[in-house]
Amino acid sequence: MKAVVILSGGMDSSITAYMAKKDGYEIIAVHFNYGQRTEQKELEAFRAIAGELNAKTYEIDLPFFEQIGASALIDTNIAIPKQGIEPGIPVTYVPFRNGIFLSVAAAIAEKEGADSIYIGVVEEDSSGYPDCREDFIQKMESAINAGTKPETDIKIKTPLIHLRKEDIVQLGLSLGVPLEKTWSCYESEDEACGECDSCRLRLKGFEKAGAKDKIPYKST
């Protein structure tokens, strides 16, 4: 059995990859370089986690995201919010990013004969991104299967979607995921800022799980 795992190198996607391995799949890890601020650090983390899993890898460049912009993750003229998580869709949302990622992953899955795509989206304890919602994932699965060969039957698996960050941290520790090799910060590549939404969620998760996050932080 083969599964394509969308692996950013972040904590959630890395734990998702280990879940796929636990489920008995041969892992095909796919990483996207799309002009994000922490592109090099994420790529380093991806390679480290994929190496731990002995996964076949694809590193896909999607430079057109920089032409689209419209997100603080890509456009350095838009500041990364550091006031805490607020209601609504934040400026760190990248327009339809997961839809595009899933489409590319589906093409790879069809080529490789994989029956599943794993993605580490989290609905309940996230920044409110619309492309992390379960309804969206279900509709993408239907669209993928409608637009591929008749014998293709791909399931999109989201093992973390209803978990809170502390549960995700505990799961990662129980699976032996080297969380110190993962990277979540939206802004920095040397030391995590400790203030962006992603850092705040990660730190809160470790704190509530009663565990220590071993990556370096500028501010905690």
Swiss-Prot record:
Keyword vocabulary terms for this entry: ATP-binding, Ligase, Metal-binding, Nucleotide-binding, Queuosine biosynthesis, Zinc
Pathway named in the protein's UniProt entry: Purine metabolism; 7-cyano-7-deazaguanine biosynthesis
SUPFAM superfamilies recorded: Adenine nucleotide alpha hydrolases-like
Pfam family, one: QueC
GO annotation terms (biological process): queuosine biosynthetic process
Family annotation (InterPro entries): QueC (IPR018317), Rossmann-like_a/b/a_fold (IPR014729)
CDD domains: QueC-like (cd01995)
Binding site for Zn(2+): 185, 193, 196, 199
Cofactor: Zn(2+)
GO molecular function, one term: zinc ion binding
Signal peptide residue numbers: none
Residues the record lists as binding ATP: 7-17
EC number(s) recorded for this UniProt protein: 6.3.4.20
Coiled-coil positions: none
Catalytic function, reaction form: 7-carboxy-7-deazaguanine + NH4(+) + ATP = 7-cyano-7-deazaguanine + ADP + phosphate + H2O + H(+)
Top-level EC class: ligase
Cofactor: binding comment: Binds 1 zinc ion per subunit.
Similarity-based family: Belongs to the QueC family.
Role according to the record: Catalyzes the ATP-dependent conversion of 7-carboxy-7-deazaguanine (CDG) to 7-cyano-7-deazaguanine (preQ(0)).
PANTHER family xref list: 7-CYANO-7-DEAZAGUANINE SYNTHASE
Name listed for the protein in its UniProt record: 7-cyano-7-deazaguanine synthase
Native source species: Nitratiruptor sp. (strain SB155-2)
